[in-house]
Amino acid sequence: MESNLKINKVELRNLRMEDYDQLAGSFKRIYADHDVFWTHAQIKKLITIFPEGQVVIVVDDKIVGCALSIIVDYNMVKGDHTYAKVTGNETFNTHNPNGNILYGIEVFIHPDYRGLRLGRRMYEYRKELCEKLNLKAIMFGGRIPNYHKYADTMRPKEYIEKVRSREIYDPVLTFQLSNDFHVRRVIRNYLPNDEESKHCATLLQWDNIYYQPQTDSYVAVSYTHLTL
């Protein structure tokens, strides 16, 4: 991140369909080595089924970050699962408004704007949303992209411990741990083409300490837009 980058305004807000062209441009910059990006139809569906779960960071009228999520039931994701399974092969038919887990399916910051704690802002929003909707936790599968450098000499468990103790830096896991997430387990083949992570991912979780289990008399919290 260039220290002399001049920024006048930073805004966190819900994603809108008119943002798609800018969003697609950022996707192509970040995932330049991949041929597949989020389609217009996929973004439209996410906004339709769960608008509060989709947010962007806007810096001086430019979209530089995005976080996408759905709601699922804990029983679906507490054990081994894949990204394809939890997203319904990216159809998001797995979204369950009556579930109890806020599940992260995407987060990114444009390379030119990293190091400004913008990602942390989106995670704080997710935590606020989790509490607002009375969900049990935030969960997601996290890559460990530096693991391939150590895979010949250590198992994933040892690698994770060394990242936790700050003996090793991992750009994804180090960030997640610094945001109060903990590793529940290692899941294999979460993203089958993730060679950098050696086909491993960490199942990460942040617990909502204010969560109140639903009872028969529980009235579901409506998707009220948060003030951003």
Model-inferred region functions:
Residues 9-23:
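A short beta-loop-alpha structural element at the N-terminal edge
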Residues 14, 25-38:
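Helix-loop element at the rim of GNAT/NAT acetyltransferase active sites that forms part
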Residues 33-59, 63-76, 81-93:
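Active-site rim helix/loop that mediates acceptor-substrate recognition in acyltransferases
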Residues 67-106, 124, 143-171, 182, ...:
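Conserved acyl-donor/pantetheine-binding loop and adjacent beta-alpha core of acyl/acetyltransferases
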Residues 110-112:
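Active-site acidic-Proline motif in GNAT/NAT acetyltransferases
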Residues 115-130:
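Conserved acetyl-CoA-binding loop-helix of GNAT-fold acetyltransferases
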Residues 167-182, 189-222:
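C-terminal "cap" of GNAT-fold acetyltransferases
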Residues 224-228:
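Conserved small/polar residues in nucleotide/adenosyl-binding loops
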